Amino acid sequence: MKCKPNQTRTYDPEGFKKRAACLCFRSEREDEVLLVSSSRYPDRWIVPGGGMEPEEEPGGAAVREVYEEAGVKGKLGRLLGVFEQNQDPKHRTYVYVLTVTELLEDWEDSVSIGRKREWFKVEDAIKVLQCHKPVHAEYLEKLKLGGSPTNGNSMAPSSPDSDP
């Protein structure tokens, strides 16, 4: 665990920072996704998400993060997968699908850091994310391939006899 000004960072036993994020969709058709401006690079777009707090479940963390970063409430859906980023720092992000039911006019990050949000067609979102945050583009690419909990990335190692 490490302390940051307004949060405590948590790590799993393998040293990965525990994160959670949501692909926030305008409707259950999942054809328009909400992206937020990056806090470091305000002219670039990212998927809302962040670090999990101690004792927090991934789904709860994902809902909290999109409320803080994107100012949305919604219906939490399926776990799309667990995505690993092995660069320093290492992250392991639980990515959920959320259908937006409420857009707040003002929200925490819009007031404190001027964060913006914008709806994108999925194909356009993939293009803008590939430049700045390729791992975020992977979330949407997986969704297009029919990602669901049964075929999501798994953190469990495969058994030796399952290799071809």
UniProtKB/Swiss-Prot annotation:
Nudix hydrolase domain: residues covered: 17-144
CDD domains, per the entry: NUDIX_DIPP2_like_Nudt4
Top EC class for this record: hydrolase
Places the protein is found: Cytoplasm
Biased composition (Polar residues): 148-164
Intrachain S-S bonds: none
Positions of Mg(2+) 1 binding: 49, 69
Residue ranges, annotated region (Disordered): 144-164
Positions annotated to bind Mg(2+) 2: 65
Gene that this sequence comes from: NUDT10
Cofactor dependence: Mg(2+); Mn(2+)
Catalysis: reaction(s): diphospho-myo-inositol polyphosphate + H2O = myo-inositol polyphosphate + phosphate; P(1),P(6)-bis(5'-adenosyl) hexaphosphate + H2O = adenosine 5'-pentaphosphate + AMP + 2 H(+); P(1),P(5)-bis(5'-adenosyl) pentaphosphate + H2O = adenosine 5'-tetraphosphate + AMP + 2 H(+)
SUPFAM superfamilies named in the record: Nudix
GO terms assigned for molecular function: bis(5'-adenosyl)-hexaphosphatase activity; bis(5'-adenosyl)-pentaphosphatase activity; diphosphoinositol-polyphosphate diphosphatase activity; endopolyphosphatase activity; metal ion binding
UniProt-recorded name of the protein: Diphosphoinositol polyphosphate phosphohydrolase 3-alpha
Organism lineage string: Eukaryota, Metazoa, Chordata, Craniata, Vertebrata
Taxonomic source organism: Homo sapiens
